Amino acid sequence: MNIPVLGGVQVNASGNLSVSDIFYPVNGSLVTLFDKNVSAAEALGNLRSKNMLGVDTRINIVGFGAFRKDHKTFWSFDLNVRMEAEANMPYSLFDFLKNGRNEAVINDIKASTQAYLEAAFSYSFPLTDQIYLGARGKFLVGAARARTSIDRLDIKLQENSWNIDADGSFEMSGLEMSSMQRPDGSEYYSFDDFDVLPNKGPAGYGFAVDLGVTYDVIPDLQLSFAVNDLGFISWGKKYLERGQMTKSQSFTGVEIIDGEVHDPEFDFGELEFDRVQASKGKTEMLRTSINLGAEYEVWRHKIGLGLLYNVRVWDVKTFHNLTASVNFHPIPWFTLTTSYSFLNGQGHALGVAINACPSWINFFLATDMLICSHTPQFLPVTSTSMNVTLGIGVPIGRRSHRIPGEYLYR
């Protein structure tokens, strides 16, 4: 049985941006790359054509499970809060803002976030002496979501105004966003001045499954395969706000002195999205992940050598990670793991994990940022990935018989 809230907390952040790419130390304090004390060459030097960042969080509210009489078949139920966010910001956007250019062509700006409740029932059982199967069915209740996509943004500074030719949209579910009204009566959304209020009741429903299998090739070698979050959420049109930006816009207010432009800062908050009445809801797939692993046991099953290949499917890109690990389990109720990960061919991370499960408690903690440099807020400075998982549970009853004793400690 899991301790409420502390039974399982998981926070993952990944992409190709690090804190050191966004913040720079200047005179004893941190400033953003847009600060005037950070040169354009330094600020833009570490950026890529597509700069991506994603975060997902899972918090276990309730969790419990039990083995059946054979002590090999296991069922469980858990209730989780899930939150996800991701963004893609092209290099041309940073170049335009940092260098203060008078014109720019910017494509493919994307940002999205969603929050939902997950009620899951899991069941795992031995199919044969060598094959063990597991499945989890998950009923999803959508709380809120927001998505902004600007496919094309052509910006040009004219004599005393910014001229914009853009193609973009935004959607919001489960949240009520205030709209503005033009003199002709048409409504529009502007991020420069708006209020957002939560709607009462669920904004959508969905279903997903997790599937997994392990295969004991020989007593010392186990292969594993799993697919997680294979499913969708259908967001109803009742709580759906939608805006569209498909026409040219012009913003005045540029200061001109003696024929020269001064302080021509562009305010993205002034972009206007025409309000569009939603004719139907929106169905979106979840972020699916795939894991393929292998572990080989040595020294009477007290040390395991592992290899894990992970694929995560995002809206903007699919990420591939490879992790090698060494697992030490000198006694039945304690495991210490060290790992080294290759992150999408662009970085690396060293991880540590501990699992202690004596008769009265089950505690686990895993992270890949213990030894890397980090901010006072415990954010990694140079790494493009951050993963933290922890949980506390209370064991009740006898241990599992899934791993035969003659293989564990001969």
Regions found by a protein language model. Give the residues of each.
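Subset of outer-membrane beta-barrel
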Residues: 1-410
